[in-house]
């Protein structure tokens, strides 16, 4: 008599390849927080100089490697502090799900910083060595976000640091290395991107409220509660779009920048997703919509600038 194996007819879950594991470690849905500011700062520079493509690429990949390193430090230190489990949502999961050694994650983070430094040397040699100081401070903040005795991620200031460092600063450095200057227009253009990068961080913290409470964190989302944090997220989206209206009305930017309003469905989707759900797993779509808001907003802002440049 033939015996039927338990679970026969069910498809066994496929084991992820090392490439897939490493890709998830980078937290790819967050990487637009680096790409968008660099693109925007470079497009704005076109109004003043002929853009150096190699400098643009060096800046882009340097910023990406810094962000990847920050995400890896996050993975390492959250595990070390006992915050990550196999059931945790939104993590790379290389340690708790795939058995990768914590030491390997730390080595990958340091290697990512090493690549960023090499690219930074080229950027500084082509522009200004003062940027080396800014870069080192940025990398220190990336490490201290989850490392050190009082990680930034454990405080209410995570959104502020990420918004300024990965939003405004990335835009301004990208503009500076092409033009050798920072002006009021570049500062004003960088503000909505800073707000939206901070919003990505806020959306992560909204999802992680309960887990972060257990880990002793005091994030802005925890202090405000789910409803208050979602209200702040919605207000952040609104301010970013209103800021563009202000730039156009005051003559600081072309009316073509109104093209950013084509991205409005994404923040609406994000806010609805957070309002309707409080379970971490059910907030993934809302989180992705928040990241996509930054992506689409930044791309459309760049397109608006490009159209006004060529007209």
Curated annotation (Swiss-Prot):
InterPro entries xrefs: MenA, UbiA_prenyltransferase, UbiA_sf, UBIAD1
The enzyme's E.C. designation: 2.5.1.74
Pathway entry: Quinol/quinone metabolism; menaquinone biosynthesis; menaquinol from 1,4-dihydroxy-2-naphthoate: step 1/2
Principal place of residence: membrane
Catalytic reaction equation(s): an all-trans-polyprenyl diphosphate + 1,4-dihydroxy-2-naphthoate + H(+) = a 2-demethylmenaquinol + CO2 + diphosphate
Biological processes, Gene Ontology terms: menaquinone biosynthetic process; vitamin K biosynthetic process
Gene3D superfamilies registered for this protein in UniProt: UbiA prenyltransferase
Keyword Transmembrane helix included in the entry's annotation: yes
Location of the protein in the cell: Cell membrane
Membrane topology summary: Multi-pass membrane protein
Matching Pfam families: UbiA
UniProt family annotation: Belongs to the MenA family. Type 1 subfamily.
Biological role: Conversion of 1,4-dihydroxy-2-naphthoate (DHNA) to demethylmenaquinone (DMK).
HAMAP family: MenA_1
Protein name stated in the entry: 1,4-dihydroxy-2-naphthoate octaprenyltransferase
């Amino acid at each position: 008599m033939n015996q039927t194996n338990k679970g026969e007819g069910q498809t066994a879950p496929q084991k992820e390849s090392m490439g897939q594991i490493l890709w998830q470690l980078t937290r790819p849905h967050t990487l637009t927080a680096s790409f968008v500011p660099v693109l925007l700062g470079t497009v704005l520079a076109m109004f003043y100089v002929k853009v150096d493509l190699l400098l643009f690429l060096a800046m882009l990949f340097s910023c990406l490697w810094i962000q990847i390193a920050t995400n890896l430090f996050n993975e390492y230190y959250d595990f070390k502090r006992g915050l990550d489990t196999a059931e945790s949502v939104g993590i790379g999961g290389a340690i708790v799900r795939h058995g990768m050694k914590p030491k390997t994650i730390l080595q990958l983070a340091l290697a990512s910083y090493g690549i960023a430094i090499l690219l930074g040397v080229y950027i500084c040699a082509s522009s200004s060595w003062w940027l080396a100081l800014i870069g080192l401070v940025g990398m220190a903040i990336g490490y201290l976000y989850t490392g050190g005795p009082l990680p930034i991620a454990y405080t209410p200031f995570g959104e502020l640091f990420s918004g300024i460092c990965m939003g405004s600063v990335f835009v301004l450095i990208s503009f500076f290395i092409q033009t050798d200057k920072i002006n009021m227009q570049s500062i004003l253009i960088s503000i909505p991107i800073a707000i939206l990068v901070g919003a990505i961080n806020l959306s992560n913290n909204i999802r992680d409220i309960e887990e972060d409470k257990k880990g002793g964190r005091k994030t802005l989302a925890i202090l405000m509660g789910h409803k208050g944090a979602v209200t702040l997220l919605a207000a952040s989206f609104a301010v970013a779009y209103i800021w563009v209206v202000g730039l156009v009305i005051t003559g600081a930017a072309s009316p073509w920048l109104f093209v950013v309003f084509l991205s409005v469905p994404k923040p609406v989707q994000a806010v609805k997703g957070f309002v309707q759900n409080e379970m971490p797993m059910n907030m993934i779509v809302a989180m992705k919509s928040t990241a996509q808001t930054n992506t689409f907003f930044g791309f459309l802002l760049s397109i608006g600038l490009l159209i006004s440049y060529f007209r």
